Amino acid sequence: PAAVSVDCSEYPKPACTMEYRPVCGSDNITYGNKCNFCNAVVKSNGTLTLSHFGKC
């Protein structure tokens, strides 16, 4: 199966919406939405990756 990914090129953003569309990171943490996840990816210098869509 192809690896799942999200495009984080527009991030980081100073604020994220409260929209709840959970994604599961490679750190086994559930992020509330793509914005929160992508901000964390940038903060991790790209070491954090997407595990799957939905809660961990």
From Swiss-Prot:
The keyword Cell wall biogenesis/degradation does not apply. Its main location: secreted. Pfam families: Kazal_1. Disulfide bonds join 8-38, 16-35, 24-56. GO terms for molecular function: serine-type endopeptidase inhibitor activity. Signal peptide: none annotated. It is found in: Secreted. One of its GO terms (cellular component) is extracellular region. Keywords: Disulfide bond, Glycoprotein, Protease inhibitor, Repeat, Secreted, Serine protease inhibitor. This is Ovomucoid. Residues 6-56 form the Kazal-like domain. The record marks 18-19 as: Reactive bond 3. It comes from the Eukaryota. Glycans are attached at residue 45. Avian ovomucoid consists of three homologous, tandem Kazal family inhibitory domains.
